[in-house]
């Protein structure tokens, strides 16, 4: 599993980092960034909560890895 954060939608509310600091941080521009680490079973709950708390729905959890570039990692 991996987390993808849509930088075009992110408004820098910080709910993702407040909810799951193990998975998210904020960049110099104030927008959310996904930390480069796997989403372990222990982190899946906080990841889902971050998805729910994002006010602009900029975060999603993908079960399969896609090719290409994204702001998220994992």
Swiss-Prot record:
Keyword Iron-sulfur annotated: yes
GO biological process, one term: antibiotic biosynthetic process
Chain residues that bind [3Fe-4S] cluster: 10, 16, 54
Entry keyword annotation includes Nucleotidyltransferase: no
Cofactor(s) listed: [3Fe-4S] cluster
Keywords from the UniProt entry: 3Fe-4S, Antibiotic biosynthesis, Electron transport, Iron, Iron-sulfur, Metal-binding, Transport
Molecular function (Gene Ontology), one example: 3 iron, 4 sulfur cluster binding
Record-linked InterPro entries: 3Fe4S_ferredoxin, 4Fe4S_Fe-S-bd, Fe-S_cluster_ET
Superkingdom of origin: Bacteria
Gene3D superfamilies associated with the record: 3.30.70.20
Domain 4Fe-4S ferredoxin-type: 1-29
Pathway: Antibiotic biosynthesis; mycinamicin biosynthesis
Co-factor remark: Binds 1 [3Fe-4S] cluster.
Pfam families, per the entry: Fer4_15
Functional summary from the UniProt entry: Specific electron transport protein capable of effectively supporting cytochrome P450 MycCI activity in the biosynthesis of mycinamicin, a 16-membered macrolide antibiotic.
Record-given protein name: Ferredoxin MycCII
Organism: Micromonospora griseorubida
